[in-house]
Amino acid sequence: MAHYFVGDIQGCFAELQKLLAKVDFNPSRDELWAVGDLVARGPDSLATLRFFRSLGDSAKTVLGNHDLHLMALHGKLKRAKPSDNLTEILESPDISASIDWLRQQPLMRELPEHQLIMSHAGVPPQWSLEVLREEAALVSCALNQDDYLEALISQMYSDSAEKWDPSAIGIERLRYCINALTRMRYLYVDGRLDFDCKQPPENCTNPQLKPWFEFASPLRQCHTLVFGHWAALMGNVGDTKLKALDTGCCWGEHLTLWHLEKDQKITQKKLKKS
């Protein structure tokens, strides 16, 4: 059995299929883990989501910011932009089933036998594994309530929850977890989240900012962290304990698959439109 981890697909279904063919992926034998953002921007979000749903227990994904955005669009809480490229999936006959499936997906997953953790954007450096589990579970619980649209999705868009406060309660606590696990790139030196800079570290001109993974973290002492979200990194983080898998396929670059057991990355260039 092989574990394959794939970066942000964002509707690049043809490239995903090319990658899986390269490694002879077999869902009866292997597992496909995705760092989130299955949908948006790319041409085939509907096919991507249907494919992951069809894999059953052979597919393991976490929620990314675009997956949560799809929930907001379906719930009529946001208006879709042309760049979202989600009209087909929103008008599909199985959209409700797709949303229900997404609601069952967590913000983090573990592979304990390999001491591995996966989330979309990373993990706040001040969090222990126990805190990560607890905070992600609170969001999952809220997503599985009947009133999830009103109680969570309608209120999750806020930059106010920018700093971890263990005494926070209610929506502010949930907001920080969603912000950190699906939107994080840079932190200020005091630990606050920055929501503006998307440049790679070598191009960041604000001396107050550091990439989240450059802060000391208790988790990375014994765990590998797999994440996506930050395409500008192009997989370059300079730490063997970090696997950055978003390599900008929807922006014209390539899709990356990481074979855990071989510690090998396989890539597929963005296909040209026929």
Curated annotation (Swiss-Prot):
Protein EC: 3.6.1.41
EC top class, as a word: hydrolase
GO CC: one term?
cytoplasm
What keywords are assigned to this protein? Hydrolase
Q: Which domain of life is it from?
A: Bacteria
Q: Which SUPFAM superfamilies match?
A: Metallo-dependent phosphatases (SSF56300)
Reaction catalyzed? P(1),P(4)-bis(5'-adenosyl) tetraphosphate + H2O = 2 ADP + 2 H(+)
* Keyword Hydrolase applies: yes
Q: Please name the Pfam families in this protein's record.
A: Metallophos (PF00149)
InterPro entries, A to Z? Ap4A_hydrolase (IPR050126), ApaH (IPR004617), Calcineurin-like_PHP_ApaH (IPR004843), Metallo-depent_PP-like (IPR029052)
Q: Does the keyword Hydrolase apply?
A: yes
A biological-process GO annotation: RNA decapping
* GO MF annotations in UniProt: bis(5'-nucleosyl)-tetraphosphatase (symmetrical) activity; phosphatase activity
PANTHER family the UniProt entry points to = BIS(5'-NUCLEOSYL)-TETRAPHOSPHATASE [SYMMETRICAL], METALLOPHOSPHOESTERASE
Q: Which HAMAP family match?
A: ApaH
Q: Which family does it belong to?
A: Belongs to the Ap4A hydrolase family.
Q: What does this protein do?
A: Hydrolyzes diadenosine 5',5'''-P1,P4-tetraphosphate to yield ADP.
What is the protein's name according to its record? Bis(5'-nucleosyl)-tetraphosphatase, symmetrical
Organism, scientific name:
Shewanella baltica (strain OS155 / ATCC BAA-1091)
